[in-house]
Structures are given as structure tokens and as C-alpha cells.
């Protein structure tokens, strides 16, 4: 509908897609479909004529029908091939980003929207989370690596209790906001990954189980979009609000050397994901984007962690995002803020891929809009908590909001 805008989106998002080729292929598919329809119409007409034709004419019609069958077979094969190519290109077609997105090739072009809270000042030399956790016997990296290889870990004792507390806090926060709690499958089929946009672009990031034609999902979002694939929802059921809880798995291909120490970048983690399906209205989607972002900020403020909200650039947000805000939380050992949350608005990009639709008040069937944001992901947030709230005795002060989940304990 707007090829120039799509070309601009392809350019600023760094997508490897020739829009002119896509348009040519679309015209070719439409033309081939017309040819198929016309050939089928001639075939039906020939069949009707055959019943009332004389013997000589029937012989002619048999020959014509045989020729038509050959033509139809060739046309259908051409149409199938062209349609498959077109679908492949359509899967690469990006959402046009919102006008406020910084234009740039990657996260180096991201801009800080606001900084909330103040990083702690220590009157002693603080430990990084690996040193502290190993000193307290709260993590075992070496034995975990024997079992599962690099970036494996085993949370132990009070650290596991802290993880449970953080997730309970996040889930209770979302219950209060009328989100439906869902424990989703982590084993998913390929169409679910295509529907959310993980495939084909990020196939290398995904663990595969070829024997069963299954994959390990990197986020609950995959299952939550898939729940409503090929459905038509009633407008009265919108917005759909889910708090998806699941183990998540990511290969982290190409991340060697980037914050890989300890618990910061691992292959398996637990996450509570906020997910919304709303009506196809940009203003409503924007309101939900602000709501999801605000909930994540509320959680971090409750925990007492300093953070920054970042406006993600066109090159960082990925093909499907209309808008993306990361939240980066202060990590004392790095002397920097690191990503703990990512809030995304995708308009109808996922809904079109997955077939998530709704019937509007006037009876019109439309593709819905989808949004998502992390509520909390562990173990990365645990690294932030133990580093920010450590004492000189290598204890950890428990944020007040978590104390009810830990039997009232103020120190770990």
C-alpha cells in the first residue's frame, strides 16, 4: 500500500530485502492466479458442453481438456513456486517504525529517555555477583558446567528463595492489574516461531529438537501469540492481557565476550512476560505500550534499583517493532546500566503472520495489535539485586517489597 515508506523502513532497520522484487513478485502471483482461474473456467465450460455435444465435438473437447489439464498443471506449479517466494519475502517485510525512533544501525544509536534512582555508594570495596554468590555458596557454576556446558549455573539456597520471591512479586503486581497468569509451553512448533517473528530472521538463536520437529522458545510471547493463531476474537474480549511465566532458552549465538560472566548472559532463564492483544488502533496501542513500560518501572522502583529507560533505534528494534523501549538496570560491577527489560509495540505485524483477528463493533474482521514487555527475568535481575544491596559482610539486604515472600527476612 505504501512502498516508499516500506523501502524507508527497510533502509533504516537494515533489513536485507528488495522491495521492488517483492512488488514484482506480488504482481506475478496475481497474474498467475488470474491465469489459473481463467483456465479452470474454460475447463468447467468444456465439461458442460461435453454433455450435450455430438460425438465429433466430444472428441475435440477431449483433446482440448487434455491440453487444458497440462496448462493448468504448469500454471499451478508456477503459482505455488511464486507464492512460496512471495511469502518468504513478506516474512522479511518490516513494520514502519514510529516517527520518534532514533535512526541508527544498532544500539549505539539508542537514546536515554530518563534515568530513575541513584546508583549506590559503597563504603567498602564491593564484590561482583560471582564473587559474592560463590562466597556465600549460593551458586555452583563448575558443577553446572559439568552437566550442561558453558554459561550453565545452579542457583542454591537463599538465592533460589530470592528468585522465587522476585517472580512472586512480579506476578502479584500483574494480578492487581487484571492480567491472566499463564504457565506456557516452552516446547513449540515452527509456526509459532514464524508467527512472532523469531523465524526466519533469528533461527540461529533458537535451540532445535529435530527428532520431534520442536524448538525451545526464548520467551513466553511465542506461545501467547500462538494461543490465538487463526482465531477471530470478539471485540468485547479485548484487550487480552497475559502474564506468561516460563523457562526460556536462547543460544546467544554471536554474543561471545559480551557480559558473559556469571549470571548476566545465560542459555536458560526464567521470565514473567507481559503480553497484550488490543484493537487495531494506534492510540490504544500507544496507551498499552506506556502501561507495560510503566509496570516494569513500578517493579524496579519497588525493588529500589536505579535504571534508565532507553528509546531504541531503528537498527536495534528489529523488523517487526513499531516502537521499542529497553530498560537498563545499574550493575555496580560493570559501572554501567545493562538491559533487564524490553518493551515492544508491533502493531499488526505478528497478528498478520499468526492470523490473530477480531470482529469489530461494526462486524468487520480486523487483524489485532500485539505488545509485550518483560515483567522480570532471572537470573540477571538477581545479579543486580545482590550487587546493589550487598553489605561489607557479603550479606544482601532484602528490598521491603520482597520481605513478605521471604518470611520477613531483612538480610540474606
Q: What are these regions, as identified by a protein language model?
A:
Residues 1-120, 138:
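N-terminal alpha-helical targeting/anchoring segments
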Residues 115-412:
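TRNA-recognition modules of translation machinery and tRNA-sensing kinases, especially anticodon-binding
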Amino acid at each position: 500500500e505504501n512502498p516508499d515508506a516500506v523501502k524507508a523502513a527497510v533502509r533504516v532497520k537494515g533489513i536485507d530485502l528488495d522491495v521492488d522484487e517483492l512488488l514484482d513478485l506480488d504482481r506475478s502471483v496475481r497474474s498467475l492466479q488470474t491465469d489459473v482461474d481463467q483456465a479452470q473456467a474454460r475447463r468447467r465450460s468444456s465439461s458442460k458442453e461435453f454433455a450435450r455435444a455430438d460425438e465429433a465435438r466430444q472428441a475435440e473437447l477431449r483433446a482440448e481438456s487434455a491440453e487444458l489439464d497440462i496448462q493448468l498443471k504448469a500454471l499451478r506449479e508456477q503459482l505455488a513456486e511464486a507464492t512460496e517466494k512471495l511469502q518468504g519475502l513478506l516474512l522479511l517485510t518490516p513494520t514502519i517504525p514510529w516517527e520518534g525512533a532514533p535512526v541508527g544501525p544498532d544500539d549505539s544509536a539508542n537514546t536515554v529517555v530518563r534515568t530513575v534512582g541513584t546508583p549506590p555508594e559503597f563504603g567498602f570495596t564491593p564484590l561482583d555477583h560471582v564473587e559474592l554468590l560463590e562466597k556465600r555458596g549460593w551458586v555452583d557454576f563448575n558443577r553446572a558446567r559439568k552437566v550442561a556446558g558453558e554459561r550453565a549455573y545452579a542457583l542454591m539456597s537463599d538465592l533460589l528463595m530470592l528468585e522465587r520471591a522476585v517472580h512472586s512479586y512480579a506476578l502479584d503486581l500483574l494480578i492487581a492489574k487484571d492480567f491472566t497468569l499463564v504457565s506456557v509451553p516452552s516446547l513449540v512448533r515452527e509456526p509459532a516461531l514464524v508467527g512472532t517473528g523469531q523465524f526466519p530472521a533469528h533461527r540461529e538463536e533458537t535451540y532445535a529438537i529435530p527428532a520431534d520437529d520442536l524448538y525451545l522458545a526464548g520467551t513466553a510471547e511465542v506461545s501467547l501469540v500462538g494461543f490465538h493463531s487463526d482465531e477471530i476474537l470478539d471485540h468485547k474480549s479485548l484487550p487480552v492481557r497475559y502474564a506468561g511465566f516460563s523457562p526460556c532458552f536462547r543460544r546467544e549465538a554471536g554474543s561471545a565476550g559480551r557480559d558473559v560472566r556469571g549470571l548476566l548472559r545465560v542459555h536458560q532463564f526464567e521470565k514473567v512476560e507481559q503480553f497484550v492483544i488490543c484493537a487495531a488502533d494506534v492510540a490504544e496501542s500507544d496507551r498499552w505500550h506506556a502501561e507495560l513500560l510503566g509496570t516494569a518501572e513500578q517493579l524496579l522502583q519497588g525493588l529500589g534499583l536505579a535504571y534508565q529507560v532507553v528509546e531504541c533505534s531503528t537498527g536495534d528494534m528489529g523488523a517487526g517493532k513499531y516502537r521499542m523501549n529497553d530498560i537498563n538496570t545499574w550493575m555496580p560491577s560493570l559501572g554501567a546500566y545493562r538491559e533487564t527489560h524490553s518493551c515492544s509495540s508491533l502493531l499488526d505485524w505478528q497478528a498478520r503472520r499468526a492470523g490473530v483477528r477480531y470482529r469489530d463493533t461494526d462486524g468487520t474482521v480486523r487483524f489485532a495489535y500485539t505488545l509485550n514487555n518483560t515483567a522480570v527475568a532471572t537470573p540477571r535481575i538477581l545479579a543486580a539485586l545482590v550487587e546493589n544491596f550487598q553489605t561489607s559482610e557479603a550479606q544482601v539486604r532484602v528490598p521491603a517489597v520482597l520481605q513478605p515472600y521471604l518470611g520477613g527476612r531483612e538480610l540474606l
